[in-house]
Amino acid sequence: MVTVEDVWRAQRARGPATVLAIGTATPPNCVDQSTYPDYYFRITNSEHKVELKEKFKRMCDKSMIKKRYMYLTEEILKENPLVCEYMAPSLDARQDMVVVEVPKLGKEAATKAIKEWGQPKSKITHLVFCTTSGVDMPGADYQLTKLLGLRPSVKRLMMYQQGCFAGGTVLRLAKDLAENNKGARVLVVCSEITAVTFRGPSDTHLDSLVGQSLFGDGAAAIIIGSDPIPEVEKPLFELVSAAQTILPSSDGAIDGHLREVGLTFHLLKDVPRLISMNVEKSLVEAFQPLGISDWNSLFWIAHPGGPAILDQVELKLGLKEEKLRATRHVLSEYGNMSSACVLFILDEMRKKSAEEGLKTTGEGLEWGVLFGFGPGLTVETVVLHSLCT
C-alpha cells in the first residue's frame, strides 16, 4: 500500500535547483545617455525649464549609464502627447502599449533561453512571469504561454508590481518549484518596459526625475531545474539558499503607485544609506552556515539601483573594485531594468568568465551572492554556487 509519505518523497528532486540557460532581450530603440537630456526636454515640451534641464543633465552625468534601450520612440511619444506630460491622465494609452509589448519582449528572451537549453519547449512544466509594467487579465504569463506555444497544462505564476527586488524573488520561487517537483523545468521571465513610468519633468518632484535618468527596458529569461540530465543539459549555477527581508525603518523609502497618470515612483535620498547599513546582516545570515565571512571571496551580482547604492555597499563592506564589475557593466550598458537587471548580470558574468578562460561561471570563484533591492525596502538574498565553465 502506497502511503502519502511515499508519494511526497517521490515528488521531490534529489539535488539543488540549477540554472540551465539564460536569455536576454531589449527593444531595438537605443538611447545615448549623453544626448538624452536634450531629447527628453524637447519631446516633453519642457525646454523652457532651463535650470531643471541642467539638474537633469547632472543626474544623467552621474548615473554611470552610457546607453539604455526604450520601447518608447519619438514617433510613439508624438502620437501619445499625454504620456509626455508630468501628471496627465494617460493610463489607458500606457496599458495599451505594455499589455502587448511586455509579453512580446519576454518571448524574445525566452526563445533565446530555450534555444541555449536545447530541449523541446514541451518539457517546460512551470512558468513564472514577473513585470512591474502594467496589469492585465489574463496576465502576461497567459499571453507568453500562447506566444511561445507552451503546453496548456504548464503551471503558471504571474507576479505584478513587485519592483526592483523581484529578480531575486523569481529565483527563490523557481528554486522551491524545481526542488519540490521532480523533473520540473521552470521558465522564469522578467520583462520590463518604461512606457508605464515615463513622464515629463516637474520642478517639485525631483525624485521622479531621478527615475527618468536611470530606468531602461529589457527582458531576461532563465530555465531552472534540479538534477540536470548529464551530457544533455549544461548547468551554470546552483541556487543554494534564498531569503527575503524588510529593512528596519525603511517605510516609504521607495514607493510606486499605479494611478490614472501611470505608475509614479517616489524615492527618498536615504535609500543608499539604508541598504548599505543593512546589507551585511543579510550576508552574515546567508553565509554563516557555509563558514564564509570574507565578502571579497564571493562573486557578486547586485541590483544596480543606481551608482550611489553600489558605491555605498562597496564602501561599507570593503569590497575590491572588481567585485561589482559585472553589475556596473550592466548598469552602464542598459540602465536600471528593474527585475530583469540581476538576470542580465548573471548572464554577463557567466559569459565573461568563459571568455577569460576562468575555471568557474562565477569569475573563477566557488561561492557568490545575488542581491535584489526594491520597494519596502525589501531585500532578496540568493546564495549561488558556480560550476565549471
Curated annotation (Swiss-Prot):
InterPro entries: Chalcone/stilbene_synt_C, Chalcone/stilbene_synt_N, Chalcone/stilbene_synthase_AS, Polyketide_synthase_type-III, Thiolase-like. The active site is at 164. GO terms for biological process: flavonoid biosynthetic process; polyketide biosynthetic process. Keywords: Acyltransferase, Flavonoid biosynthesis, Transferase. Pathway: Secondary metabolite biosynthesis; flavonoid biosynthesis. Its EC number is 2.3.1.74. It is an enzyme of class 2 (transferase). One of its GO terms (molecular function) is naringenin-chalcone synthase activity. It catalyses: (E)-4-coumaroyl-CoA + 3 malonyl-CoA + 3 H(+) = 2',4,4',6'-tetrahydroxychalcone + 3 CO2 + 4 CoA. PANTHER family: CHALCONE SYNTHASE 1, HYDROXYMETHYLGLUTARYL-COA SYNTHASE. The primary product of this enzyme is 4,2',4',6'-tetrahydroxychalcone (also termed naringenin-chalcone or chalcone) which can under specific conditions spontaneously isomerize into naringenin. Belongs to the thiolase-like superfamily. Chalcone/stilbene synthases family. This is Chalcone synthase 3. It comes from Camellia sinensis (Tea plant). The lineage of its organism: Eukaryota, Viridiplantae, Streptophyta, Embryophyta, Tracheophyta. The gene is CHS3.
